[in-house]
UniProtKB/Swiss-Prot annotation:
Keywords on record: Cytoplasm, Endonuclease, Hydrolase, Manganese, Metal-binding, Nuclease
UniProt function note: Endonuclease that specifically degrades the RNA of RNA-DNA hybrids.
Record-listed a divalent metal cation binding positions: D77, E78, D169
GO cellular component, one term: cytoplasm
Record text on cofactor binding: Manganese or magnesium. Binds 1 divalent metal ion per monomer in the absence of substrate. May bind a second metal ion after substrate binding.
Encoding gene per record: rnhB
UniProt cross-references to Pfam families, sorted A to Z: RNase_HII (PF01351)
Protein name: Ribonuclease HII
Length: 260
């Protein structure tokens, strides 16, 4: 095996079957560079296997529905229930039966860069994507729970072709379609995880646009959540039309400044 260079071995490794006798010869190679190469290859292989296993776990509910004859399954999730400013955004995503999105997970577990990359991949492969947006003013008129349900219904109604079944993260969508409510659905269903990415990226982009309109509030940094920076900006500059006046922290600041 010494006649092979490290570069030769690096090219050979992906081609070796599990039972290839050359594995044992490589493991007995005394060169440190070869052993380091083997260790790196095994780590990469283990990571790929973990990603594949994770995908199979995420597809469990979808595969059960496919086996029952359901063809178009929409995952539903939202972003922006907790912030003090900006809309609540819901997304509905129908993935193809043969979809494979390695690295997909609950959007909260992903970096902004990974979310953006997955957003593009989901857009490229999805059968349909629907988005529903409910403004801060509408949230104040209803309440955040009902506003979120309305955003989800809008997202479902925007799907073309329409879904046959819904997988929803915890909530019930006000529509007549059959649906399953999954606790922590964005961590347990590929369709819901895809919807969580679409909803999160869509809302983040919206908040970055608001940051250009209201640069003094720092929306691009905190996305409307109640950070010390955000509270200080509200106290100093007041509230914008994008703030949720029905939310207690905003209401308290308004009372203190006699704006309510």
């Amino acid at each position: 095996m010494k006649r092979y260079t490290v570069k030769d071995i690096e090219a050979l490794l992906p081609k070796l079957g599990a039972d290839d006798p050359r594995w044992e010869m490589l493991r007995q190679d005394e060169r440190k560079s070869v052993q380091a190469l083997l260790a790196r290859f095994e780590r990469q292989k283990a990571r790929r296997h973990a990603i594949e296993q994770r995908w199979e776990e995420l597809m469990r509910y979808e595969r059960e529905l496919y086996a029952a004859g359901v063809r178009r399954i929409a995952g539903i999730d939202e972003a922006g229930r907790g912030p003090l400013a900006g809309p609540v955004v819901a997304a509905a995503v129908i993935l193809p039966k043969d979809a494979y999105l390695p690295g997909l997970d609950d959007s909260k577990r992903l970096t902004p860069e990974k979310r953006e990359a997955l957003f593009a991949q989901i857009e490229a492969c999805a059968v349909a994507i629907g988005i529903g947006i409910v403004s801060a003013a509408e949230i104040d008129e209803r309440n955040i729970y009902e506003a979120t349900r309305q955003a989800m219904a809008k997202a479902v109604n925007a799907l073309s072709p329409p879904p046959e079944h819904l997988l929803v993260d915890a909530m019930a969508v006000p529509c007549p379609l059959p649906q399953q409510r999954l606790i922590k659905g964005d961590a347990n269903s590929a369709s819901i995880a895809a919807a969580s990415v679409i909803a999160k990226v869509t809302r983040d982009r919206w908040m970055k646009e608001l940051d250009r309109r209201y640069p003094q509030y720092g929306f691009a940094r905190h996305m409307g959540y109640g950070t010390p920076e955000h509270f200080e900006a509200i106290r100093r500059y007041g509230v914008t039309p994008e703030h949720r006046r029905s939310f207690a922290p905003v209401r308290e600041v308004l009372k203190a400044s006699e704006q309510l």
